[in-house]
Regions:
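A common structural junction motif
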Residues: 197-204, 296-304, 410-421, 646-655, ...
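M16 family metallopeptidases and their MPP-like homologs
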Residues: 59, 64-77, 82, 86-88, ...
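Sec-dependent signal peptide recognition
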Residues: 2-9
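Short, conserved charged micro-motifs
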Residues: 188-190, 286-290, 344, 400-404, ...
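Hydrophobic h-region of N-terminal signal peptides that target proteins for export
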Residues: 10-19
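A conserved hydrophobic secondary-structure block that centers on an alpha-helix together
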Residues: 255-269
Length: 975
């Protein structure tokens, strides 16, 4: 076995050594444009710098006619003024509000009031007396209402929806602010016109309602113990750097006193072409597209951008643990300050993390998680430009203190520093990163973000490309020296304990009034975009007979095949048409595959071998299906298949391991009482299905404790005796793949009948109902549910149109009303969900996360949208155009083809239903959609489920929305 590993490592090192000559920076030119590239770059990326300093980075990928776009600014929260933190994040929000050419029906008239609003804010920020501040804010609200008569909300969202963009969003972090879209390739001209105008002269309109959304975002962070720990850790690690001195969302006192003039000043200083980049990954012609970028963004003028001066951080004299209090589960976090991405030894920082924890065979994986020493432990590396942070986290199991968890984690740091790990782990980490990169660079989104990182962190892309090679060549002694040098007293310890947080200060809701949306108004700029003539993309749908090859491995065991023509990676899945609804013990049984070994190998040795092969196997028990997945490079395919198959057929369950696992499950269930998301899910299940639902019918604590090793072993050993399908996606042909799988994947002659999934029927309420569960939090989480109709494939186009128009995105009437007009939430959406199989029912679902003091307004507003769907022919036609544009340019690729086929079969669809959506969407009329809303949503009694604090919410007053029932945690979990 050792000889096999050494041979494999030698071959990989030889191939990588030859590749080490690659990644050299080169220059070339085409059609008058000079660009740089790197030899051997799998993304074939090119980097151009235009005359005005604008960077353009391009990577062509013709797998599908779409382009992933990023417009990046090398300015984030690090660049915020110390007395005005949060500006970068504010500005990111305002870049969706338009310019003097769109987002307005009459900018000259609007500007008069916008100037008044800006002056009022400047005055507001100077006044300290609360009564005076309320008077001024009332004036801001009043003038904003007048200004809003001339604004047109969401025109940016309407335009990108119109061109078929998906994933429209933006984010702000320490070093960057980035604006993203995934667009059809035939809409590149329209997208460039939209974006060049967007950045030309942004107008800070509809500010006070957007400010409310930022307040909501801040209050959400106050309910999130992870966020609080993260902020405290960075503040402790960085006493001189803005990483620790300020946060991206900003300080509460600064958020309460926003300055529009300071935001504009930030824009003028940082949003300049020599500080920005356009990154494109997808289907386009580089030279043609570059000429268009130059034409559209040539107006931008280069300006000097001052670099921040860095003050070195000091090594700590002593480590003083910090305590953070909150309602959620207890955990300990340890953070180490390391050199940043620009360091020539960044690859060693990555290696430190991978040797510590890689989810398979790291020190934490083998010494802690596999032995179940704590409830859960992990490590990750947060890569930043100036300093990385290596973060370790641990959750205690029953009877364990946070200090004990800390000691267990620190023991792994000591093992790293003193070289108590297998040297193979280093080369295997490099091999695994190489394989992961190969997979990532085949995807346009992952490629775009990799190229984005190289720009904003100011490192050559070749540096990231070379990291797997550098890692594999690293000697153990060098990594140990690096660990001893870096893992000294430069760390922080945060104990997150349960208790009432008396430090965090919630931002109180200011008194504001809804602003008009002017949905049916349209600016000339937007009309021109929508009227643009384009060359249509020809849609491409899956042919279930031609695109998927089918064969039999045995009786009632079909293999589904689609080839990987992109690289040498494979994915193998065993899919069973039953899940935890059929057998509540399945998730526990399959978990043992990760924790126990066989008569030949221990679990730790199995994990090491999988990692050495750069293969991962995952087990997943969903509600109605079960999956066993194996993936990795084709060169190690046979060995990986043989190991996995032997493990399943010969698993030896250790009694102590089973007992520890059961105790951990019991602890996780206890922790759910302090997890608002778990509470929300459980309450939603209760509201949807009643007292007997997927949460309350889980295996009970008593049954858990009665589980025996024999039960688990038999369940796993017999798994392949049940009917299942084998899904193969990889570089081999069907005959080759099948013959190798058959060699190891032997199926018993005596077959078992597959267990039947339990059916949970939704409740059709005869009257409106409200369920409430108490949890101490600043926010309130509100869900709406109602039972839908049985599955009908003929309604698929209609449901697509309804969701796109009603509540699926930022251009929807639901989002516009709840967030843009009334500023009631940061996150909100609504949609009609189709069932997962042909015999179950659909479901209408809506969600609003809001401040507790806005709960009444939120419920009233959503109920109004449920009773009456707002009418806008403009938005309706826009929604239909978006759907057809996406359907034409969307491509289902790789193993997703096989899973889409199985999903279609469960719904009794014999062909790719996207064909109907593409062809029939434009035939749908507004009255048809209105009738769907009336019959499937308005006509149904809604059940509202609320998670919030009874100290902040008057539960007695909720009866105006329906019959109120307060449910305890015991009732909704029922363990």
């Amino acid at each position: 076995m050792r000889m096999k590993f050494l041979t494999l490592t030698f071959l990989i090192l030889c191939s990588l050594s030859s590749n080490a000559q690659f990644f050299k920076e080169k220059k070339d030119s085409s059609k008058g444009y000079v660009y740089t590239y790197f030899e051997g770059d799998p993304t074939k990326s090119r980097k151009y710098i235009l005359k005005n300093g604008l960077t353009v980075i391009m990577s062509v990928n013709i797998d599908k006619p779409r382009i992933y776009t990023c417009i990046a600014v090398k300015a984030g929260s690090n660049n915020d003024p110390k007395n005005n933190t949060g500006l970068a994040h504010y500005l990111e929000h305002m870049l969706f509000k338009g310019t003097d050419r769109f987002g307005t029906s009459d900018f000259a008239k609007e500007k008069v009031y916008l100037d008044q609003i800006e002056a009022l804010y400047e005055n507001y920020n100077k006044v300290k007396d609360e009564k005076q501040r309320k008077v001024i804010y009332a004036q801001i609200d009043s003038v904003s209402a007048i200004a809003a008569k001339y604004s047109i909300a969401n025109e940016y969202d309407k335009m990108v929806q119109n061109i078929g963009a998906q994933g429209t969003n933006a984010f702000t972090s320490f070093e960057e602010t980035v604006y993203i879209n995934d667009i059809p390739a035939n809409q590149i001209d329209a997208w460039l016109e939209i974006e060049s105008e967007r950045f030309r002269n942004p107008i800070l309109r509809l500010f006070h309602t957007e400010l409310e959304a930022v307040y909501e975002e801040k209050n959400i962070s106050l309910d999130n113990d992870d966020e609080k720990v993260y902020e405290m850790m960075y503040a402790d690690l960085f006493k001189n750097h803005n990483y620790g001195l300020q946060t991206t969302i900003g300080k509460t006192e600064h958020l309460k006193n926003p300055s529009l003039s300071k935001i504009r000043e930030y824009y003028t200083k940082n949003y300049v072409p020599n500080n920005m980049a356009i990154i494109l990954s997808g289907y386009f012609d580089p030279e043609e597209t570059l000429a268009k970028i130059e034409k559209n963004f040539g107006y931008m003028v280069k300006k000097e951008v001052k670099k921040r001066k860095l003050v070195p951080e000091k090594i700590k004299d002593k480590i003083v643990p910090i305590e953070v209090l909150g309602e959620e589960t207890e955990f300990v976090t340890i953070g180490y300050r390391l050199p940043g991405m620009q360091s020539p030894e960044n690859y060693k920082s990555i290696l430190l993390k991978e040797v510590l924890e890689n989810s398979v065979a790291g020190l934490i994986d083998l010494n802690i998680n596999k032995k179940l020493l704590v409830l859960e432990a992990s490590a990750y590396l947060e890569e930043n430009k100036d300093n990385n942070v290596l973060i370790l986290r641990g959750y205690p199991k029953q009877g364990q203190t946070l200090e004990q968890v800390k000691d267990i984690l620190m023991a792994q740091i000591d093992s790293l520093k003193f070289g108590k790990f297998d040297e193979k782990l280093i080369s295997s980490a490099g091999f695994n990163l190489k394989v992961n990169n190969e997979k990532s660079y085949a995807d346009i989104t992952s490629t775009a973000f990799s190229l984005l990182n190289s720009f904003t962190k100011e490192i050559p892309f070749s540096k990231k490309l070379a990291e797997p090679i550098q890692m594999m060549k690293t000697k153990k002694i060098d990594l140990v020296i690096y660990a001893k040098m870096q893992l000294k007293n430069n760390y922080s310890i945060i104990y997150k304990r349960q208790g009432k947080d008396t430090v965090s200060v919630k931002i109180i809701k200011p008194e504001i009034h809804p602003v008009p949306l002017n949905r049916d108004k349209i600016s000339r700029f937007v009309k021109n975009i929508m009227d643009n003539e384009i060359t249509e993309v020809k849609p491409q749908f899956i042919d279930f007979e031609k695109d998927i090859l089918k064969d039999s491995i045995a009786s009632n065991c079909q293999i589904l095949y689609t080839p990987n023509k992109k690289n040498n990676l494979f994915t193998l899945n065993y899919v069973f048409e039953f899940g935890r609804y059929a057998d509540q013990k399945l998730p526990i049984a399959l978990e043992m595959l990760k924790l126990c070994g066989t008569d030949k190998q221990s679990s730790s040795n199995l994990s090491k071998e999988f990692y050495n092969l750069a293969c991962t196997f995952n087990v997943s028990v969903a509600d109605e299906q079960m999956y066993i997945q194996l993936n990795g490079p084709d060169s190690t395919f046979e060995r990986a298949v043989s190991i996995l198959d032997y493990l399943i057929k010969n698993l030896k369950v250790d009694e102590d391991v089973l007992e520890d696992l059961i105790n951990n499950i019991l602890q996780e269930r206890e922790n759910n009482n302090f997890d608002k998301n778990a509470i929300r899910r459980a309450l939603n299940n209760y509201a949807k299905f009643g007292a007997e639902n997927p949460t309350t019918t889980q295996i009970s604590n008593k049954e858990l404790k009665r589980l025996k090793t024999k039960d688990i072993e038999e369940k796993i050993h017999d798994i392949f005796s049940y009917n299942h399908k084998v899904l193969y996606f990889g570089p081999r042909d069907l005959i080759s793949a099948k013959s190798l799988i058959v060699k190891y994947h032997t199926i018993p002659k005596n077959r078992n009948e597959s267990p039947t999934n339990r059916v949970f029927n939704q409740i059709q309420y005869t009257e409106p109902q409200v369920y409430f569960t108490d949890f101490n939090m600043v926010q309130a989480e509100i869900n709406w549910n109602s039972q839908g109709a049985n599955y009908d494939s003929r309604k698929a186009p209609l449901i697509e149109v309804f969701n796109e128009y009603y509540g699926a995105g930022m251009a929807s009437v639901f989002f516009q009303t709840i967030r843009e007009s009334k500023a009631l939430a940061y996150s909100t959406y609504a949609d009609y969900k189709n069932p997962t199989n042909s015999t179950s029912q659909g479901n209408f679902f809506a969600y609003v996360g809001t401040q507790a003091d806005k709960l009444d307004s939120a419920i009233v507003s959503v109920n109004a949208l449920i009773r009456e769907i707002p009418i806008s022919e403009t938005l309706f036609e826009n929604a239909k155009k978006s759907i057809t544009s996406v359907a034409a340019s969307e491509r289902i690729l790789n193993d997703k083809i096989l899973f889409y086929y199985l999903k279609s079969k469960r719904l009794n669809n014999t062909y790719d239903l996207r064909k109907d959506i593409f062809e029939k969407t434009n035939q749908i009329s507004f009255p048809e959609m209105q009738a769907f809303h009336t019959n499937e949503i308005k006509a149904k009694n809604q059940v509202i489920s609320i998670v919030g604090s009874k100290d902040r919410i008057d539960v007695g007053k909720l009866n105006k929305y329906g019959k109120v029932q307060v449910l305890t945690l015991k009732e909704i979990f029922n363990y």
